[in-house]
UniProtKB/Swiss-Prot annotation:
One of its GO terms (biological process) is translation. InterPro entries: Ribosomal_uS19 (IPR002222), Ribosomal_uS19_bac-type (IPR005732), Ribosomal_uS19_CS (IPR020934), Ribosomal_uS19_SF (IPR023575). This is Small ribosomal subunit protein uS19. GO terms for cellular component: cytoplasm; small ribosomal subunit. Belongs to the universal ribosomal protein uS19 family. Pfam families: Ribosomal_S19. The gene is rpsS. HAMAP family: Ribosomal_uS19. Keywords: Ribonucleoprotein, Ribosomal protein, RNA-binding, rRNA-binding. One of its GO terms (molecular function) is rRNA binding.
């Protein structure tokens, strides 16, 4: 179920302050975050975030197409190794 429009997008408060500090400094450094649930806002465009996936920080460069999505969508938590091979076909 989608979030109510009258509530607005959810963003952790510390994330806004971190992004503001990086914008003011002018340096293009990776902002490490653990908040996968936060929504990407227009003021984050052009910044690079290190989104934690449970084991490491995955670098995510934000562009205009990502606005409105969550940070967690761009940092996969599971590694897919493919389906198991058919053992009968392997023996022959």
């Amino acid at each position: 179920m989608a979030r109510s429009v009258w509530k607005g997008p959810f963003v952790d408060g510390y994330l806004l302050t971190k992004a503001e500090k990086v914008r003011e400094s002018g340096r293009n450094e990776v902002i490490k975050i653990w908040s996968r649930r936060s929504t990407i806002l227009p003021q984050f465009v052009g910044l690079t975030f290190g989104v934690y996936n449970g084991s490491k920080h995955v670098p995510v460069s934000v562009n205009e197409d990502m606005v409105g999505h969550k940070f967690g969508e761009f940092s996969p938590t599971r590694t897919y190794y493919g389906h198991g091979a058919d053992k009968k076909a392997k023996r022959k």
